[in-house]
């Protein structure tokens, strides 16, 4: 899942992904958070 959340490192996305999608992991791609589903 792509998001509009800005990031610089993948760990910044983990709590974002948890809140948005209920998944614990994501990564930073192209300065935006992407969440695993």
From Swiss-Prot:
The record marks 27 as: Basic residue of the functional dyad. The modification Pyrrolidone carboxylic acid is found at residue 1. It comes from the Eukaryota. Residues 26-33 are annotated as: Interaction with Ca(2+)-activated K(+) channels. GO terms for cellular component: extracellular region. Expressed by the venom gland. GO terms for molecular function: ion channel inhibitor activity; potassium channel regulator activity; toxin activity. Disulfide bonds join 7-28, 13-33, 17-35. InterPro entries: Scorpion_toxin-like_sf, Scorpion_toxinS_K_inh. PROSITE patterns: SCORP_SHORT_TOXIN. Has the structural arrangement of an alpha-helix connected to antiparallel beta-sheets by disulfide bonds (CS-alpha/beta). Blocks selectively the high conductance calcium-activated (maxi-K) potassium channels (KCa1.1/KCNMA1). Belongs to the short scorpion toxin superfamily. Potassium channel inhibitor family. Alpha-KTx 01 subfamily. This is Potassium channel toxin alpha-KTx 1.3. It comes from Hottentotta tamulus (Eastern Indian scorpion).
């Amino acid at each position: 899942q792509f998001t509009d959340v800005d990031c610089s490192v993948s760990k910044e996305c983990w709590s974002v992904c948890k809140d948005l999608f209920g998944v614990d992991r994501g990564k930073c791609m192209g300065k935006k958070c992407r969440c695993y589903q």
